[in-house]
Amino acid sequence: GYFNDGFSLQTGTGGASLAVTRFMADKMVRNKIKARFGLGGITASMVELHERGLIKTLLDVQCFDSVAAESLGKNPNHQEISANQYANPSSKGACVEKLDVVILSALEIDTQFNVNVITGSDGVFRGASGGHCDTAAAANLTIVVAPLVRGRIPTVVNQVTTCITPGSSIDVLVTDHGIAVNPARPEVQEHRLAAKLPVMSIEELNQRAYSLTGEPAAIEYTDRIVGVIRYRDGSIIDVVKQVK
């Protein structure tokens, strides 16, 4: 596994990802583990781990709250980095290339492990992707944490509304109903089974989600393209069309 002394991590800004940071601290103390660096958009929870001595260095490409901003001014090992230093795929020194574990959120994830963090289930823009696809591609272990359903809306779907991060970059999906491991990572699957965690296929999670919410009706679009989704290398991997 990667949860060893000197590991590196990034957590996303979704509620589930932030909760992981809080619970991880207790396990780090119990196991006497300290992280070499924490990366990405920095939040109060990451600052807390840093100030407790659990994360040696914070590499900050974006402060997400006032606590992080204040920390940047007073903690010498809380260091500001540029987006180029953070995740430029053409740079040999990009920080994401040194990541052991990244924990990300998702609006949708489909049965091919493709992830959507841009558009909602109604096809309308909801937010930005930040370094989602960059960290997912570069980290040694990429974990998506999300609820199986949000109200009446399934998170695990047949096909994502918009593909932001290709499924080939996602290793594990953790939901409140079970854990799915990408078949491309059989060694990760073995670790999860050995730990007696509730592992199931992503298709089973999809069926369970639909049994609770029903299968969503297809969104109707016009032919007008209102957004172009570029992957980290600049290639176009999807488009967003105007909803009727």
Features from the language model and the residues they span:
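Conserved phosphate- and dinucleotide-binding cores of soluble alpha/beta proteins
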Residues: 1-8, 19-28, 32-36, 44-244
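Beta-strand-loop-alpha "switch" segments that mediate conformational coupling across diverse proteins
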Residues: 14
